[in-house]
Amino acid sequence: MSSLSKEAVLVHEALVARGLETPMRAPVQEIDNETRKRLITGHMTEIMQLLNLDLSDDSLMETPHRIAKMYVDEIFSGLDYSRFPKITVIENKMKVDEMVTVRDITLTSTCEHHFVTIDGKATVAYIPKDSVIGLSKINRIVQFFAQRPQVQERLTQQILIALQTLLGTNNVAVSIDAVHYCVKARGIRDATSATTTTSLGGLFKSSQNTRQEFLRAVRHHD
């Protein structure tokens, strides 16, 4: 991973050490993204033909390529650490020692069990130590880890570990509330339920007052 940013390497190594990295096999050989898209296009063509879809129809003929491009460049782009967001961290010269919260971060992910949509919002908080992070970078970190096949529990913890690693503090909290289309659109077909996951570190875990302050922020939009 020598071609990656220092921040990307640190985050990846922290997740691996904790057993929280997305399950990925070591590639037999490195292939570029254009080759990857070409190969996926071929496999999607076979899948659609097995479904008896007519790929000569002008509405369907480009679908395999569209899906391949979507997978590699968009909804699974977070599998590629070369796309890890550029992180701006500055010295905490202001001596901020109270909770900083970013609420209602929109995220769209993909259930790794059925490859259908997870649609939700995240709330992220941290108590600065020596560094503070550009607020938009929190949104970008959430979106990076959402752009993978995911389970919500792991996604929540990945965001937590990434921010703890980059900020040099355990005092981070993450909550995600999401609708899973593997529940909504198939199986039980429950269109109204949502899933909430929370991951707490440092004072958010050990201090009841800090934890309650965060949970009040999570509920603020209700």
From Swiss-Prot:
Toroid-shaped homodecamer, composed of two pentamers of five dimers. Belongs to the GTP cyclohydrolase I family. GO terms for biological process: one-carbon metabolic process; tetrahydrobiopterin biosynthetic process; tetrahydrofolate biosynthetic process. The keyword Cell inner membrane does not apply. It catalyses: GTP + H2O = 7,8-dihydroneopterin 3'-triphosphate + formate + H(+). It comes from Klebsiella pneumoniae subsp. pneumoniae (strain ATCC 700721 / MGH 78578). The keyword Metal-binding applies. Zn(2+) binds at C111, H114, C182. One of its GO terms (molecular function) is GTP binding. Pathway: Cofactor biosynthesis; 7,8-dihydroneopterin triphosphate biosynthesis; 7,8-dihydroneopterin triphosphate from GTP: step 1/1. Its EC number is 3.5.4.16. NCBIfam families: folE, PRK09347.1-1, PRK09347.1-3. This is GTP cyclohydrolase 1. Gene3D superfamilies: 1.10.286.10, 3.30.1130.10. One of its GO terms (cellular component) is cytoplasm. It comes from the Bacteria. InterPro entries: GTP-CH-I_C/QueF, GTP-CH-I_N, GTP_CycHdrlase_I, GTP_CycHdrlase_I_CS, GTP_CycHdrlase_I_dom. Keywords: GTP-binding, Hydrolase, Metal-binding, Nucleotide-binding, One-carbon metabolism, Zinc.
